[in-house]
């Protein structure tokens, strides 16, 4: 009996080793591309940035392309968090006595100004903190909003943060909401913002690159980015976005095409042969 158990353990370890060695091959052979239209958005496009500035840092050119392809009436931006917990507010003493709602307003001033430069319509900007009437982040309402868009509009491309390849826990939770709904087949087209340093972790055939290539596109992108750097006290703009994430903004400024990279939805599935082998262990 002990001998049989030892054999099973050895065989299990061997099987795991084989799976690890062939992992890359399995990924390449088992990518679900049937419902993905590469670099083509569905009739309606909804972006779900977690914080004010995420839509620009990771999606400025993607938003421009979405509007060009589907029209401004069919492109929506859904802000998931109120953004009032950004490090600028906690580290700079001038903000200590400002109410949280006022901090949110300061961030939204930059957010709305940036989207206006890109041509996003005011009626298509949805701030979940306003709808939920509570502070913080709003993952449950995000899920309801995703499902509402899917059910009411039918042909929708949903874009959130990546559920794994992101160094911000709130971004990953944001992406997990979208991934779960796609895993459960409740939505058809899910894609994810990619920070530049994680692009290498995504298979090449699952990456989408969006660039601002014309003078008009580049002008729009730069003006949108500048809204997070501009200081204009009279308009309630204090350059909060740039101050809190200046290195990310500087990298984007250095890119002449203001490139946005998205990852399309994909899953790794175990091959049937491994399921059968596992059954006999």
Where do the PLM segments sit?
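Helix-centric, low-specificity signal for extended rod-like, repetitive segments
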Residues: 1, 100, 260-263
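N-terminal Sec-pathway targeting helices
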Residues: 1-15
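Phenylalanine-focused residue identity feature
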Residues: 11-14, 41, 47, 76, ...
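Hydrophobic core
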Residues: 15-22
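Compositionally biased, intrinsically disordered low-complexity regions
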Residues: 22-25, 241-243
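Active-site beta-strand->loop->alpha-helix modules in alpha/beta enzyme cores, enriched
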Residues: 23-184
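The feature marks non-catalytic terminal segments
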Residues: 110-118, 122, 186-281
């Amino acid at each position: 009996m002990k001998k049989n158990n030892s054999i099973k353990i050895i065989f299990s370890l061997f099987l795991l080793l084989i799976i690890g060695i062939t992992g890359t091959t399995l990924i390449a052979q088992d990518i679900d591309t049937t419902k993905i239209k590469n670099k083509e958005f569905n009739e309606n496009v909804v972006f779900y940035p977690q914080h004010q500035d995420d839509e620009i840092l990771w999606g400025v050119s993607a938003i421009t392309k979405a509007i060009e392809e589907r029209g401004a009436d069919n492109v929506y931006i859904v802000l998931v968090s109120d953004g009032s917990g950004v490090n600028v507010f906690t580290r700079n003493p001038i903000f200590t006595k400002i109410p949280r709602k006022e901090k949110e307003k300061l961030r939204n001033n930059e957010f709305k100004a940036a989207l206006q430069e890109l041509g996003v319509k005011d009626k298509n900007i949805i701030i979940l903190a306003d709808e939920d009437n509570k502070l913080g982040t709003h993952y449950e309402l995000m899920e309801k909003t995703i499902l509402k868009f899917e059910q009411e509009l039918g042909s929708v491309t949903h874009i959130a943060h990546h559920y794994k390849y992101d160094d911000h826990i709130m971004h990953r939770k944001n992406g997990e909401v979208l991934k779960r709904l796609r895993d459960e087949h409740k939505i058809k087209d899910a894609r994810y913002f990619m920070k530049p340093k994680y692009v290498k972790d995504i298979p090449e055939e699952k990456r989408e690159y969006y660039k601002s290539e014309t003078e008009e596109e580049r002008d729009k992108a730069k003006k949108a980015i500048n809204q997070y750097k501009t200081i204009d006290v009279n308009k309630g703009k204090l350059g909060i976005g740039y101050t809190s994430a200046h290195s990310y903004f500087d990298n984007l400024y250095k890119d002449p095409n203001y490139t946005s990279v998205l990852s399309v939805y994909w899953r790794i599935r175990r091959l049937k042969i491994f399921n059968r082998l596992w059954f006999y262990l």
